[in-house]
Amino acid sequence: MTKKFLFLMAFLSISVMYCFGQVNPQAPLELDKNVRYGKLDNGLTYYIMHNEKPAKRADFYIVTNVGAIQETPAQDGLAHFLEHMCLNGSKNFPGKGIISYMESIGCKFGENINAGTGVEQTSYMLNNVPVIREGIIDSSLLVLNDYAAYVTNDPKEIDEERGVILEEKRTRDTYQWRMSVAVKKAIFKGSKYADCSIIGTEENLSTFKPQELQNFYKTWYRPDMQAIIVVGDIDVNAVEGKIKTLFSTLPKAQNPKPKDVITIPDNKEPIISIFTDKELNATQVTLYMKNQPMPKEYRALGVSFLNTLMQKLISGMLNERLDDISKIENAPFLGAGTQFGAICNTMDVFLAGVQAKDGEGVTAFKALLVELEKAKKFGFTQDEYDRAKTNILRSFESAKENAASRQNGQLVQPLVSHFTSSWPYTTPEYDYTTAKAYLDMVPLVAINQSLPQLFRDDNMVVTFNAPQKEGLVTPVEKDFVDAIAYAKSAEIKAPVATVSNEPLLDATALKGSAVKKTAPGKFGTTVWTLANGIEVIVKPTEYKKDQVIIKTVSNGGKSILPVELLPSIEKNIFQIYLQNAGISKFSSTQLNKMLTGKVASAVPYLSQLEQGVLANGSPKDLETIMQLIYLNYTAPRCDAKEFEVGFNQIKAVLPNMMKQPDFFYSVQLQRAMANGNARMPILDNELISKISIDNIKKALGISFADAVGTKVYITGNVNLDVLKPLVEKYIGSLPVKAKKAAMWIDQNLDLPKGIVDKTFDFEMQTAKTTVGLVYSGLIAKNIENDILMAAATNVLDQTYTKTIREDEGGTYGVSVQGVISGLPKEDFYLLLHFDTEFAKSKKLIEMAKQGLVDISTKGPNVEYVTKARENLIKAFPEKQIQNGYWAGIVYEYYSHNKDNYTNYIETVNKIVTPENIQKFIKQMIDQNNRLDVIMNPKAK
């Protein structure tokens, strides 16, 4: 037995010591009885489950338990290439027949028709298929059947797809990708995993023989390696019969090739990886401790549940400590965290990582190691353990409460894990009961006794990743070896318990304000008008039992703030403030501990024209949510030292981020769209000098000191009788001072007029051209135009997929985004965005522009319009089982007098026509406002 196996054995011994006779860790876990599970004679596995969230929809999956790690050298990248080819011709769906058929019933490529290739497995999915006719179920299963054994792999189609995949590789070849390659070589040193890239080399993608692809397909795509999963609003018995009839015809493999089981060698001394890159944005050091995975024969037993539970407890307590340290003044690191996980079939890891200021990576790593040694030496305190247990059990409870609202995709993933990795598929109700039983029985001493087996000296890997820039000294391997030795000999003090039972506020001191008027509202809402003038619109739902969403809204926003305050509330800076702010007299670390076991959050927001508080949580914690909303208005926390902790993070990484092509491009795009308006601050190195906590405090004071004119939207599982007194107490106590509500100001934040070219060169390691074409102008904001914009972007998606992706092989994809604003002006912008090779860029840019011109003069492809219309019709009922959708519908109606729900389907059927799409696109491009933001690689 290797040392790597000892951690599991420690858990097994704990199981026997503390759990025997109450819950039996060696007994099988109870599988979800609602899943129909079976296996055909040819070896194919199937899972079927009935679910009506959403109604008349189903997900169809085929999972092949093989990924890129089984490729031969000549097949490098072909597992992923094959995934593409499954959509490029099969026995019953020649050419693009699968995509064409699925789009004809309202599904969308990329969203509902997709696939994913991993190192260990490959999955193909048809999501949210409208199973409104029996024939659609039959056809969806036929698609899976073709994936399983009847993909054409036509050499002509293969050659056409090479360019698409090479462009996908170009798009993915970022600093993150290069860093992941270096990390894999260290973690998997001495094994095939170290060189498994999934996407393959450019040389092999360009030159492989089609027969190699066919060989991979015929070797691995076979019934004994495949599972069919169908979850949705279907008849389980009927679907099982269809699967047996259709898939039993797949031939059983003769002399099937077994999968190679690839192990990772043990290492006695630490493996150290040092990687630098000019485009890397931060210094990161990560410690990996390699462990043997839970043997498959144990995964179906209670011990696997206990194992996972103890890992959650340990990482939760460690992360609380590390988070607290990161928020102190002069912290040794900017951020840190730990987690457990599987990174391949034959290895699990415990990892602990830190983000440091440039040049301080070794110091940060030492601080991290000291915390691990502290846990190993002294264990955790009882108050830490109690908080961790409470939070974990609350997460299980929330999952139990929301079990009935799970949508198909949430139900599919545990079934995939069961097939590929033998992890059991249990119910949230069973998980909650089991977790509670274990948490009630496993004492803190059991956790602390297991830590020495976790924090060992062998099988360690350390990865250091940092920016490569002048003047920054890169550490060497010895620095990290010395850091490990330092932590082991350091003088470490035992942790001190920190407990606070202080309430958020004295609720008895609030005077409140009674509901003076109650009226039935639109969409099943109830409208309360409080004596202080605040209007509360409540939409009770039961879509998620353990969720309530609250939004307070009043006019003004950034538009009424002095221009000198705006840099300090730029969206990224404001987010940093929120992450570190806390509330009232409580720091963020204190607040987190005070909210142990509660699902409650509330944060202020400032948009261009509005301000308010966004809150969400559990109905059980509704009073806490209301208290947080109240405190955001009356006691925002603006502590200079706490803000500086977060601000230091952005100051540390921003100069490096400006060297990343994608980030730099986004800055230039935002700057060009802002058109030089000082009221549109863009995060860059210059902006940093204009930011202060005092200006944040002033902005919050102006925005939240007076709640006059505020509307409050509450959506979710609320009882009006329970909610009403809380609204009267907390919303009724918000400060209302002025007689008249503020109004937003039109600050003329308009995009540039005319044809504007912003082309620039940028130094990058992987040469590519990034294109953004922004069309803009005036257009009426109404439901008809919103629908036409959604349909038009869909039509353009299909158009560019055909012309630029498939015909030219010029890009992995063209992103099309269209937005219509109603305030302060009724206007729009349409953004076309893609990456490509510099040599192809001019041609593709002209093709993108001409695509719009052709539609405006000749009309769109009629089939594309039909598919776009069907997609809008299909998507409409799917949204209606989500609280977020109804929160938006109610807000638009009561704040902007826009009804985006009533007669929606009728309107779609009426207006989504080729003629209207043609007119709509013509209306947009005829205004002759186009901003071209194009980044080319700087010549080396």
Show the residue positions of the predicted features.
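Proteolytic maturation boundary segments
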Residues: 20-45, 235-309, 315-323, 327, ...
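Bacterial Sec-dependent N-terminal signal peptides
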Residues: 1-23
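Active-site His/Glu-centered metal-binding helix of metallohydrolases
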Residues: 78-86, 314, 574
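Peptidyl-prolyl cis-trans isomerase
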Residues: 101, 150-158, 171, 442-446, ...
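Hydrophobic, small-residue-rich alpha-helical packing segments that form membrane-like cores
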Residues: 157-225, 229-231, 236-245, 251-261, ...
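Internal metal/ion-chelating core segments
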Residues: 204-243, 677-682, 687-729
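M16 family metallopeptidases and their MPP-like homologs
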Residues: 49, 54-71, 77-79, 96-146, ...
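Metal-associated gating/positioning segment near the N- to mid-region
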Residues: 85-93
